[in-house]
Amino acid sequence: MSAAQNKKIVEDAIAEWRTGNPEAFYEILDENVNWTVIGSTAVSGTYTSRQAFIDGAVQKIGKRVDGMVVPEIVDILTEGDKLVFRWDGIGKMADGTPYHNRYSWAMTFKDGKVVEGTAYLDTALVDTLMDLPDS
């Protein structure tokens, strides 16, 4: 697939996420995606499948936010099968504290699916979030 097609896949998934369907993004991840969350937070590490990433990071974060984190696209940069998606995640922590994190996700596509990704983010903010009890 072309860089433009990969960009469209991400844009469409984010549009769905913004309407209340965050699972749309996770559906573009290959079942055996290799996804790394940088840092030393409770959700940092390398996940070797879509389900492991959802279980090990996404759900843990989701249990500590009020509602969902809404993505605001900053920009999407593409070259060949590589794509960098910079975005702001906006929401509220379970205790009512505003949550505003800037993310940069570097991804590699193959046949329309993300096969590798690295998530860069404000890890200090994630530490604060992870200190909250599950909601």
List each model region and its residues.
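Short, low-complexity N-terminal intrinsically disordered segments enriched in polar/charged residues
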Residues: 1-31, 131-135
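A beta-strand edge to alpha-helix "cap/lid" segment located at domain peripheries
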Residues: 2-5, 58-135
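Hydrophobic pocket/interface hotspot
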Residues: 10, 24-29, 33, 53, ...
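Short, flexible active-site loop motifs that bind/organize anionic cofactors or intermediates
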Residues: 12-15, 43, 116
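Generic secondary-structure boundary/loop-capping signal
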Residues: 25, 30-32, 44, 96, ...
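A solvent-exposed, acidic/Ser-Thr-rich amphipathic alpha-helical stretch
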Residues: 30-79
